Amino acid sequence: MTVPSTRKDLMIVNMGPHHPSMHGVLRLIVTLDGEDVIDCEPILGYLHRGMEKIAENRTIIQYLPYVTRWDYLATMFTEAITVNAPEQLGNIQVPKRASYIRVIMLELSRIASHLLWLGPFMADIGAQTPFFYIFRERELIYDLFEAATGMRMMHNFFRIGGVAADLPHGWIDKCLDFCDYFLTGIAEYQKLITRNPIFLERVEGVGIIGGEEAINWGLSGPMLRASGIEWDLRKVDHYECYDEFDWEVQWQKEGDSLARYLVRISEMTESIKIIQQALEGIPGGPYENLEIRRFDRVKDTVWNEFDYRFISKKPSPTFELSKQELYARVEAPKGELGIFLIGDKGVFPWRYKIRPPGFINLQILPQLVKRMKLADIMTILGSIDIIMGEVDR
């Protein structure tokens, strides 16, 4: 009697592209042997809009509304890097009050981004309840944004030399109330998620990245800090006024999906600490540098004329970008967000290269999922935290 031989053909499965509200329009071509992942090939570019080329045909002020469409869940950071680069090129000083307002907005945006990472991440691994709790907290942050900027998501709030408007009356008290409330929410998450045995079973020891490996791949943000590298641009580059606050860089040694979760949860607590200190110590003074108007190329300027305030369509000042090159970067929720800017004595940048953290961090995905189970792909992909708007640009 002959025993029938079992076929051992590999199976090729397409995962995605998903809806942008989940993991974005990312397609993974996965080769499987049963449930074991043999190979994984990410296919990018479904959300490519030519953001760098658009930047080279716009002035910096005209380009500001576009940048909120890179990482549309942490728009304050894309605005910050867009104004920081020309500020450094033109040596423009930002008033102390404006710098404090920027830090408050950046840290609120960091919390909102981490919350919107945590909800779908938990849903991916089978926990539906935290998803609704997280949206409850996120709505409160968006209410604060709406009161200060007029918009819930695409804020267009940062300006070269400051911010668009001062904080409205009563906003600081509302924000302090939110900080007190949110600390209890973090404790709730710790109780609900961190010590949950089913959650730990799904994430502990899954997708391990060593410290040296993380550096070699160019990882940044929580991906790097979860691998034992204590690197945070807020401490390294001393931008804005982060040096004036008492806070610690959050990091873990294990390098797995659980470590990346713990880093982000701890970062939210540190962000609240920074916001509370900034709100209590915010100085008076102007919220924008009025001197930047001297950069206006129009010689016969009308900024100071009496009837100017009655003109419905006001011309924006334009800035000559000096003939030099510059790399500016900020610590975004997902990692190092940078811009390589080359000026050419014109109002348009000669080159505008975006360094998105999600694109760099996503490179390690095929290596992480090999020899893992099919169900672990969503755990690992979720722990990387990508937004395809900034990956594809």
From Swiss-Prot:
Its main location: plastid. Keywords: Chloroplast, Membrane, NAD, NADP, Plastid, Plastoquinone, Quinone, Thylakoid, Translocase, Transport. One of its GO terms (molecular function) is NAD binding. SUPFAM superfamilies: HydB/Nqo4-like. It is a peripheral membrane protein. It is found in: Plastid, Chloroplast thylakoid membrane. Transmembrane segments: none annotated. Its EC number is 7.1.1.-. InterPro entries: NADH_Q_OxRdtase_suD, NADH_UbQ_OxRdtase_49kDa_CS, NDH1_su_D/H, NiFe-Hase_large. NDH is composed of at least 16 different subunits, 5 of which are encoded in the nucleus. NDH shuttles electrons from NAD(P)H:plastoquinone, via FMN and iron-sulfur (Fe-S) centers, to quinones in the photosynthetic chain and possibly in a chloroplast respiratory chain. The immediate electron acceptor for the enzyme in this species is believed to be plastoquinone. Couples the redox reaction to proton translocation, and thus conserves the redox energy in a proton gradient. This is NAD(P)H-quinone oxidoreductase subunit H, chloroplastic. The gene is ndhH.
